Amino acid sequence: MNRLLIRGATILTMEGPEAIIETGELLIEDGWITHVGLPGSASGSFDMDEVIEADGQVAMPGFINCHTHAAMTLLRGYADDLPLMTWLSEKIWPFEGRMTNEDIYWGTMLACLEMIKSGTTCFGDMYDCMHDVARAVEKTGMRAMLSRGMIGIAPTADKALIEAEELARNWNGKADGRITVMVAPHAPYTCPPDYLDKAMNLAAKHKLGINIHLAETLTEFEDIKKQYGKTPVKHLDQLGLFKLPVLAAHCVHLDEEDMDILAQKAMGVAYNPQSNMKLASGIAPVAKLLELGATVGIGTDGTASNNNLDMLEELRAGSFLQKVSTMNPEVIPAYRALQMATIDGALCMGLGDRVGLIKEGMRGDVILLDTQQPHMCPRHNLVANIAYAANSSDVRTVVIDGKVVMLDRVVKTIDEERVMYEVRERAARLAGK
């Protein structure tokens, strides 16, 4: 049995706004959190494989990035300041068409490095060559929900379905259970009804959920209404998509009925505020969705449209954007923003029984943040300091599935210099430089 004790930290369990243990300790045994309490309260506290002294730090659940395209780190800064469809058709898709399996592996390795160093322990990914994405996840020690993005109008549509099924068979539940799989028809505007039906049948066959972009732009909203006589959400509802667990990314352009459907039927909505701002897609009505009872997590989207994977930045931007768009400073307060970036993100991906909280019986995905920094002083409100003042360099240590993957800012599972060298070389080749 492997026993890891984290001692002396203030523990933000995310079980409630007041569920904070000052100078506490938590014990992780064989990947499971088995004890959370006051110092010295863990049984056999002298018989540990590893002890982390965490005085002056906060222990909290790792951040959960509900929606990204990890390998797109290769495209960071390649194409900016363009409308979504121009950006995709003229820049992103041609670049991606030149990418090899190894390019995708190394791009994902860089994404995992960036996420670990900014406190993300789990992410939801939609992309191509997912075997290579899974290899990177397995090597780095991260947790991930992976899905092979499928474009139903592309010549590769049938091949993508085969690869999606191979991903499910080969990787669902692998890497000691850290990898789970969903089925990912790209979006209603790229997947006709007959193709969506094939995707739903595949998901039902393997008891998987659906991961899909939905109602991201006004163009999509209007085009789907013109083509099918319904909004994108109602179109998918009529097709029966929401009979399966659905993680819907973006959900920017919604009417009242759409919001009711998502609140009642979707497993979760992935809110991507910075990508939506950068691409001028609009502002998702998240405050209203939450009021209706929807489960909303936070995603960064890919680095080509953000341009980083920093969940602290994302949750802060997401909170502030809702405040100003509703002209109500009380919507999405600090604790709610942290919930969206942790336990609500886990629920969105069907992982709420495993991660997102620090409590006995959950897997040991924990981060330690340094609170002894000028921008974290004074401490009138710990939760507000984390949500509104902390930055990614405050993340000192990252534990995933009970294993220490970063200790005192040193990532133990990744050769940082090699990863950045590989990405620089490959990005230059792909860009034709």
From Swiss-Prot:
Note accompanying the cofactor annotation: Binds 1 zinc ion per subunit.
Molecular functions per Gene Ontology: 5'-methylthioadenosine deaminase activity; metal ion binding; S-adenosylhomocysteine deaminase activity
Protein name, as recorded: 5-methylthioadenosine/S-adenosylhomocysteine deaminase
Domain of life: Bacteria
Gene3D superfamilies assigned: Metal-dependent hydrolases, Urease, subunit C, domain 1
Native source species: Desulforamulus reducens (strain ATCC BAA-1160 / DSM 100696 / MI-1)
Keyword Hydrolase tagged: yes
UniProt family annotation: Belongs to the metallo-dependent hydrolases superfamily. MTA/SAH deaminase family.
Entry EC number(s): 3.5.4.28, 3.5.4.31
Cofactor: Zn(2+)
Signal peptide: none
